[in-house]
A protein has these predicted regions:
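Ser/Thr/Pro-rich, acidic low-complexity intrinsically disordered regulatory segments
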Residues: 9-10
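Metal-centered catalytic cores of metalloenzymes
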Residues: 2-5, 14, 19-77, 81-145
Length: 145
């Protein structure tokens, strides 16, 4: 009897915990960065790619941005939002100047509003140069399973 009660309690605990585990997801984030995606578009052969992950349980965003053919060294880089394609927005996540040489690697823990905007596709990443201080290459961030 006691053993059956223990097994029943264990089964109930697993059943109740399973939906919580299922709700957490590791998502892939990506963006193709081009000069044509800047607002307004820029004249540059620069291009790049963002790859990374977003953990919905810890709210941690990890990124790797690789770029090349800019008009000069990167002077700044940021995640911006919320903004749809073709619109500009303020900085959501700054990237330290010491991390600017390609590849740019980093991580940040997002707030609830930041997570909402990221998952809605309302963030973009851009890389700035001295010739293009408003941004030389840009890409809209998508989060997918």
């Amino acid at each position: 009897m006691k053993r059956n009660l223990t097994l029943s309690t264990l089964a109930l605990t697993i059943a109740l915990a399973s939906p919580l585990v299922a709700m957490a997801d590791m998502l892939n984030v990506h963006a193709d960065l081009t000069a044509a995606s800047e607002v307004p578009p820029k004249a540059s052969d620069g291009h790049g790619q963002l790859t990374g992950t977003y953990d919905t349980s810890t709210k941690e965003l990890q990124w790797n941005v690789v770029y090349s053919n800019l008009t000069g060294p990167a002077t700044m880089a940021h995640f911006h939002g919320p903004a749809p394609v073709g619109k500009n927005a303020g900085v959501a996540i700054p990237i330290a100047a010491t991390d600017l040489p390609s590849p740019i690697k980093g991580h940040a823990t997002l707030t609830d509003p930041q997570e909402k905007d990221l998952l809605a596709g309302e963030w973009y990443v851009n890389v700035h140069t001295a010739k293009n201080p408003g941004g030389e290459i840009r890409g809209q961030v998508a989060a997918t399973k």
